[in-house]
């Protein structure tokens, strides 16, 4: 019998054992290639709502589609569903259960923004990415959790689209209507900022409770009816929004003139309600909705959806959130496949109890960071458009601008972040208001763009504050009946305001409210408009910069400027007739009178007997002739052409001088020579003079800013008080606006005057709240009133100007006419005179050239004396004397008579001048020697002719 070796038996056993183990390992490896890893994903939704049912259906379809086309993936998402029961606490409890008990790697949900806040904090603590496709509140971003992923657009992305619509139609004010929770409040700051960027403003807010009943909704709607603004931006959940518009239609707020702008909170889910009733109540509404680009993939999905719900109702209508849910699951499945699944476990702290919901035992996922990183890198074209996460959420996308018309949701435009609103069909990007959108049908089936505001017709009157003053009642006078306490406002400002209201294209009924202030502080009255106590302020309110910070002013309806008023000094003067001309003009004129008289004497002395005779006679005649030209009363005739030329030019100069003198003297008597006591306001500061200002006005601060000391400022409340301060010497000058100064001057025109404006202001204007729609219309109406005759009638009624009051615009500065105004005339007269004199001298020297060149008289002095003697003689060759001589010869009286020099029996009477002239001729003839013999007969003939002429 053969005995086996024990050692050999052991080796054989070991061989088979190793072979078995290797085979088992190889088998496990082969089997592992066909196995997948399950990734737990929690889903928290309100399962009893149609919205959640649609989204859950979309999630299941997404999982089926994804793994159908990616069967080779080694990971599979396992969905664990929890019902949040439309409750914030229940949603947080569901998330806590998924994290603690199921140890999910990610959570999808919740449905609302309110449910999401605490869930995000739990997920952040456990490092579990929470992906929401429907929580759009911008406030969730402030949690600043890296594990919060928003696979949808938040509400901040649509506010710029809404602002673009407001800008496109030129509206300036809107009313924000939103649900009273985090969802509604989150959009308001962003909407306000976006509207301000386009110069529009949220002027009022209306909060609607989430669970509001019909009575609460109606109460808020009636409040909206009392507001002037008719542009409403509505942001609320669809269920509340549908009831809101139903009530708005019932009370007539869906008629012409109203503008309703809806956010995508309602527009994205329009089809989730009974289609007919919801759209019927929202005719003419504009809204924005996330734009879903067309694609083949989306088209196929819609066909499959319709097959799944062949008899679909509105509850089964596919919406943008169902598409977002589909894309969210797709993105998560893609991210999971790219991660390392070896870290699929939680790190748990030491438990402090057996309570399953104890937050102290909440584990931390090791897988969360890698999954979050992979998710942020996912990018693909989904059903709702491009899917790419930027900072944990989708980027701002394109929005459709929707107009609800009948049963249709007509797309009339698109809004893009890059170029704003464009026409949906023409892609027009013109900047003209309203032309970027297609035709819009507004509420009430109107095609006219609403102006965005109107005066309420519910009986509410415009509350107008007016100041109660003690003085200057011409502007505003609030008369209060002590018995009935009824107020009757009158005055210039009131009448202007009522005239302006009549020019408006609609009816505005003012209700005047008296503003009583001990110090008549206008700043405080204007501030009441800012607080809402008044709808407007009417009165003598000046437009100044600090007031315009919190209210709006209309265009001014009065003159602008702050001027200085000073007393007049009456400069009555005996020598007032000398005032029109300055001293240099008087002296120059007098010198020219003498000069012209001298020139005329030179030109006329040899040919005109009026300018001959004794020296004193000739001097008197010359002066008389020259000065009598002032009134053209000279009786002497000029016979020389040169003298006539000089006199003609001089008469023109005198005419201009006399007319100017008369006009200026008249103006001096018109203003009565009144002069201001002060002309420079800076002198008041220099000499520390007291000045007055109207109590309660901005003038006080203006004067202090210009350097006036507080002790110099003396207030007054009326024109009478101002006159008293001047009369008793308390003030030297007063500063006030031009309108007030005119009132004072109309009562005391002979005592004070207004110096030119020192400081510029904008004048009086009406006050309205910031961005009030009335401001522009009232400003346009002011232009119509001020440019017409009605304005002048109102001014004449309240500011009657006395007949003896000088023109306030008349300059009281020096109006002396100086030589500089007439030097051209004097230059012409001087040139004409010297030219005539030069011609005369040249002719005279030419006639006596034989004397100048005669060698018998070598002495220059002798020749000069000879020329002087000849100048003093009559020019017998003159046409004047020749004419007289011819007349004497042909006269029948002298015909046949003897010479008067030889006939001594019947001498003709001779004047002393005639004797003097004959004597001079004889002396001249004797002294000339040889000339006497040659010219004696001629002299006798001349004497005879002269005597005969004078005898006649």
UniProtKB/Swiss-Prot annotation:
Cellular localisation: Membrane
Residue ranges, annotated region (Disordered): 889-914, 932-952
Tissue specificity statement from the Swiss-Prot or TrEMBL entry: Expressed predominantly in leaves.
One Pfam family hit: Lig_chan
Listed SUPFAM superfamilies: Periplasmic binding protein-like I, Periplasmic binding protein-like II, Voltage-gated potassium channels
SMART domains for the chain: PBPe
Transmembrane portions of the chain: 583-603, 613-633, 638-658, 822-842
Gene3D superfamilies attached to this UniProt entry: 1.10.287.70, 3.40.50.2300, Periplasmic binding protein-like II (3.40.190.10)
Keyword Membrane appears in the UniProt entry: yes
Record carries keyword rRNA-binding: no
Positions in the Extracellular compartment: 33-582, 659-821
Cytoplasmic-side positions: 604-612, 634-637, 843-952
Signal peptide: 1-32
Entry keyword set: Glycoprotein, Ion channel, Ion transport, Ligand-gated ion channel, Membrane, Receptor, Signal, Transmembrane, Transmembrane helix, Transport
Positions with biased composition (Polar residues): 889-908
Residue ranges of coiled coil: none
GO molecular function: calcium channel activity; glutamate receptor activity; ligand-gated monoatomic ion channel activity
Membrane topology, from the record: Multi-pass membrane protein
Glycosylation sites: 34, 60, 355, 428, 546, 664, 728, 748, 784, 809
Self-association and partners: May form heteromers.
Function: Glutamate-gated receptor that probably acts as a non-selective cation channel. May be involved in light-signal transduction and calcium homeostasis via the regulation of calcium influx into cells.
Family, similarity comment: Belongs to the glutamate-gated ion channel (TC 1.A.10.1) family.
Protein name according to UniProt: Glutamate receptor 2.7
Biological classification of the source: Eukaryota, Viridiplantae, Streptophyta, Embryophyta, Tracheophyta
């Amino acid at each position: 019998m053969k005995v086996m070796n024990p050692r050999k038996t052991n080796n054989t056993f070991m061989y088979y054992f190793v072979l078995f183990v290797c085979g088992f390992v190889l088998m496990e490896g082969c089997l592992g290639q066909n196995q997948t890893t399950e990734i737990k994903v929690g889903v928290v939704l309100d399962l009893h709502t149609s919205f959640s049912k649609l989204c859950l259906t979309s999630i299941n379809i997404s999982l089926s589609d994804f793994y159908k086309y990616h069967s080779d993936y080694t990971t599979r998402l396992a969905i664990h569903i929890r019902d949040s029961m439309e409750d914030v606490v229940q949603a947080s409890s569901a998330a806590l259960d998924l994290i603690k008990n199921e140890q999910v790697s990610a959570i999808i949900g919740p449905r609302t923004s309110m449910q999401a806040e605490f869930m995000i904090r739990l997920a952040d603590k456990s490092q579990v990415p929470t992906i929401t496709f429907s929580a759009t509140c911008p406030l969730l971003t402030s949690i600043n959790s890296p594990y919060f992923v928003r696979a949808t657009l938040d509400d901040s992305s649509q506010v710029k689209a809404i602002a673009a619509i407001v800008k496109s139609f030129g509206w300036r004010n809107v009313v924000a209507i939103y649900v009273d929770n985090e969802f509604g409040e989150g959009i308001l700051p962003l909407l306000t900022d976006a509207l301000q960027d386009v110069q529009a403003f949220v002027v009022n807010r209306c909060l609607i409770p989430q669970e509001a009943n019909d009575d609460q909704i109606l109460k808020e709607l009636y409040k909206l009816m009392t507001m002037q603004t008719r542009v409403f931006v509505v942001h609320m959940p669809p269920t509340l929004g549908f009831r809101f518009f139903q009530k708005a239609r019932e009370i007539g707020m869906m008629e012409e003139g109203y503008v309703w702008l809806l956010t995508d909170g309602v527009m994205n889910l329009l089809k989730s309600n009974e289609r007919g009733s919801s759209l019927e109540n929202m005719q003419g509404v504009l809204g924005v909705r996330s734009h879903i680009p067309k694609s083949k993939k989306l088209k196929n999905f819609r066909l499959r959806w319709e097959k799944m719900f062949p008899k679909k109702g509105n509850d089964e209508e596919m919406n943008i959130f169902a598409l977002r849910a589909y894309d969210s699951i797709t993105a998560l499945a893609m991210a999971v496949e790219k991660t390392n699944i070896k870290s699929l476990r939680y790190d748990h702290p030491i438990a402090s109890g057996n309570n399953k919901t104890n937050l102290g035992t909440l584990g931390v996922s090791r897988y969360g960071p890698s999954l979050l990183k992979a998710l942020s890198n996912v990018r693909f074209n989904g059903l709702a458009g491009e899917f790419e996460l930027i900072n944990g959420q989708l980027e701002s996308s394109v929005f459709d601008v929707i107009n609800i018309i009948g049963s249709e949701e007509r797309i009339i435009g698109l809004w893009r972040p890059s170029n704003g609103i464009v026409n949906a069909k023409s892609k027009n990007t013109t900047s003209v208001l309203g032309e970027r959108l297609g035709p819009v049908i507004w509420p009430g089936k109107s095609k006219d763009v609403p102006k965005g505001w109107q005066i309420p017709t519910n009986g509410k009157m415009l509350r107008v504050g007016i100041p109660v003053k003690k003085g200057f009642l011409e502007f505003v006078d609030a008369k209060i009946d002590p018995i009935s306490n009824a107020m009757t406002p009158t005055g210039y400002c009131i009448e202007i305001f009522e005239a302006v209201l009549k020019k408006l294209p609609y009816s505005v009924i003012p209700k005047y409210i008296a503003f009583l202030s001990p110090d008549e502080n206008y700043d405080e009255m204007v501030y009441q408009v800012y607080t809402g106590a008044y709808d407007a302020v009417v009165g003598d309110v000046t437009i100044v910069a600090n007031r315009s910070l919190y209210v709006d002013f209309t265009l001014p309806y009065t003159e602008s400027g702050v001027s200085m008023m000073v007393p007049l000094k009456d400069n009555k003067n005996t020598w007032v007739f000398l005032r029109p001309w300055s001293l240099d003009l008087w002296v120059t004129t007098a010198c020219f009178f003498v000069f012209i008289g001298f020139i005329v004497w030179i030109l006329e002395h040899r040919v005109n007997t009026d300018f001959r005779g004794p020296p004193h006679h000739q001097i008197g005649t010359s002066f008389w002739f020259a000065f009598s030209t002032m009134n053209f009363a000279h009786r002497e005739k000029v016979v020389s052409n040169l003298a006539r030329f000089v006199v003609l030019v001089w008469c023109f100069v005198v005419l201009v001088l006399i007319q100017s003198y008369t006009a200026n003297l008249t103006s001096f008597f018109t203003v009565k020579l009144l002069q201001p006591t002060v002309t420079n306001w800076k002198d008041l500061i220099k000499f520390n003079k007291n000045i007055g200002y109207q109590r309660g006005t901005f003038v006080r601060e203006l004067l202090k800013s210009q350097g006036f000391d507080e002790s110099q400022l003396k207030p007054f409340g009326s024109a009478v008080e101002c006159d008293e301060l001047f009369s008793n010497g308390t003030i030297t000058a007063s500063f006030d606006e031009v309108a007030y100064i005119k009132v004072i001057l109309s009562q005391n025109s002979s005592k004070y005057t207004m110096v030119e404006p020192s400081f510029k202001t904008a004048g009086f204007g009406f006050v309205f709240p910031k961005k009030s729609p009335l401001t522009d219309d009232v400003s346009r109406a002011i232009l119509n009133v001020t440019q017409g005759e009605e304005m002048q009638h109102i001014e004449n009624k309240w500011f009657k100007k006395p007949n003896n009051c000088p023109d306030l615009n008349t300059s009281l500065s020096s109006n002396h006419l100086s030589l500089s105004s007439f030097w051209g005339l004097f230059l012409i007269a001087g040139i004409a005179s010297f030219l005539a004199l030069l011609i005369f001298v040249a002719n005279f020297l030419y006639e006596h050239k034989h004397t100048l060149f005669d060698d018998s008289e070598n002495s220059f002095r002798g020749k000069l004396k000879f020329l002087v003697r000849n100048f003093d003689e009559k020019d017998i060759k003159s046409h004047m004397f020749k004419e007289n001589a011819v007349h004497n010869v042909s006269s029948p009286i002298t015909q046949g008579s003897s010479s008067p020099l030889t006939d001594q029996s019947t001498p003709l009477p001779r004047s002393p001048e005639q004797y003097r002239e004959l004597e001079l001729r004889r002396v001249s003839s004797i002294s000339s020697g040889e000339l006497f013999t040659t010219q004696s007969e001629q002299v006798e003939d001349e004497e005879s002719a002269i005597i005969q002429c004078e005898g006649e």
